[in-house]
Amino acid sequence: MRNVNTIKINFKGGIISPSGLYNILISVSKSHLLYVRFGLRQQLLIDVNIEDMDFIRAELNMLGIIYEINKDEYPNIVSSYPAEEIFIIDTWLTGDTYKRIFEMIDYTPRLKINISDSNQSFTPLLTGNINWVASPSDRDYWHLFIRFPKTNIVYEWKDVVHSKSVAAISKRIEEIIFAQAEKFYDNKDASGDELFELTKSGNFTTKTEEAPLTLPPYKLPYYEGINRYSDKYWLGIYRRDELFEIRFLKEACLLCIKTGIEQLCSTPWKTIIIKGIQEKNRYDWNLLLDKYQINMRHAANELNFQVDDNSLKALKLKHHLVKYLNDDDTRTFGVCIGIKTRLKSEVFSSILVRRKPLIRIGKGGLFYVYDILCAKDFNPNERTAFAFSKDNPKFLLAEQLRRAVLSFYKYHGKTDVVKAVVTNEVESPDAEP
């Protein structure tokens, strides 16, 4: 029996009001809670002892906060807004555009929605059910990828959709999927073409897609520390155990309010980013980091892991694998490693470690082993392409993962050589016609 319940609070697109978060933290800290966490879908997660639940619920209800307990029936909307300005520069998609779309989503989605710039790989493009990716060439138009619920079927929409119709089409698609669940929900034969035809009756601003979208290559930026952009700074904070001390977050919120920062952001890496720090306030932020001993320079091979939410087993396995890779001094730049411990959960990864029982008993099992799966072209925005290694016991897993990482570099080394050869042939004046 669980002695702890998890309260989930969504923040659309990972945009968090400092004053709103501060009020939540004040309320939950009255029950002597010390830590909160952030999830893969940029949501706030609060672990509460059963005996404190009634008090916490009353506090959140007083604030008018919408929340779920031990459920995710209404998933948060994921967006690349946290990367805007700092990791994404050459784009038509501005912070105001994100916010206008969020305002138009005037219902509470039951399907997972991702809203992403195409010119980035900091946030996942296709881990939602309704995945909007900004057109790299058509201003205010979006490509749409449907991943049917409880399946790995991905369908690229035949039209590109104007920003003003993103919310309405999202709502219409959700209505159709749930109204005809036998066709579109947990059905490996779901038809994207049929869903497309069923939405055409709506009054939406769209135009025919000229060509399929080419997904961007995966390059994870270093997302922690105090870093300069334009004439300001951004601060990224990662916690190894995923736990953010409430006292620290409260002071961070107050400092945001004091210095005129209107929002902070949660990210799909279970971190926070604070943008818009002025030069004159940088010292204050450094003092706050010093006060709470916030380490800012973790190894890249730790920062590129994604693990299931609410999974201590996944987190412990991550630490085990990171230690092995560190001890071996293995290079992991450019690789996103995921750990999946639950059936049909969605984890963003180039290389996925999937835990499974040899003997399944209901929702549990006995004698767990691990598969290592690789995405197409090792791009985490693509679907799984092949199994690198299957049924590994834990004592062999770390070495098998190291070998999978080596295969990543071997693959990219070969493709880069091919690209270089092709480029030279095209550019050489002596090449045969």
Language-model segments: residues:
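Long, internal scaffold/assembly segments composed of regular secondary structure
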Residues: 177-270, 275-278
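N-terminal intrinsically disordered, low-complexity tails enriched in polar/charged
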Residues: 1-10, 427-433
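Aromatic-residue detector
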Residues: 36-38, 46, 182-183, 191, ...
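N-terminal secretory/membrane-targeting helices
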Residues: 210-219, 246-249, 254-256, 314-315, ...
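Mobile "lid/hinge" segments at catalytic clefts and subdomain interfaces of large enzymes
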Residues: 105-202, 359-433
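Small-residue-enriched alpha-helical segments and adjacent helix-cap loops
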Residues: 3-150, 236-362
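General structural signal for secondary-structure boundaries
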Residues: 17-18, 49-51, 93-94, 161-166, ...
